[in-house]
């Protein structure tokens, strides 16, 4: 395995009522609450063009994840067969990146209220990308 390393610097943080992994739903569509994304002032200019009603992809770093897990029961359900972590959306993985498709509900300065999102309070945000609605073939 390559020993090349890359540095990722968070651009912000999630502020959520979800205080622990146990409190978080497995997926955003499973009764996840709204949350705030607090974007660092040094990169806040990058929010220009994002508007209320926009769908965005938040890329987060699951800072509470176990990075040494390669196989698991999907959704921690012991009745399901063990499978490789790359065939699941488990936060426990070698590089615990989270992808969250959310709606922008409110913008206040360098803060975005988004939802629904299953990320816990304090989760680092490493990037924000727009949802592209057009086909990649066009």
Question: Where are the predicted features?
Answer:
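Glycine-rich, low-complexity intrinsically disordered segments
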Residues: 1-101, 105-138
């Amino acid at each position: 395995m390559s020993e090349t390393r890359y540095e990722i610097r968070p651009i912000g943080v999630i502020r959520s009522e979800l205080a622990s992994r146990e409190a978080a739903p497995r997926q955003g569509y499973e009764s996840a609450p709204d949350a705030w994304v607090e974007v660092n002032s040094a990169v806040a200019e990058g929010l220009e063009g994002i508007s209320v009603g926009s769908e965005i992809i938040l890329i987060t770093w699951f800072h509470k994840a176990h990075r040494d897990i390669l196989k698991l029961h999907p959704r921690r359900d012991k009745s399901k067969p063990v499978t490789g972590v790359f065939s699941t959306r488990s936060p426990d993985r070698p590089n615990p990146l989270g992808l969250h498709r959310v709606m922008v509900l409110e913008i206040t300065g360098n803060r975005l209220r988004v939802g629904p999102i299953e990320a816990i309070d304090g989760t680092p945000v490493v990037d924000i990308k727009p949802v592209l609605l057009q086909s990649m073939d066009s």
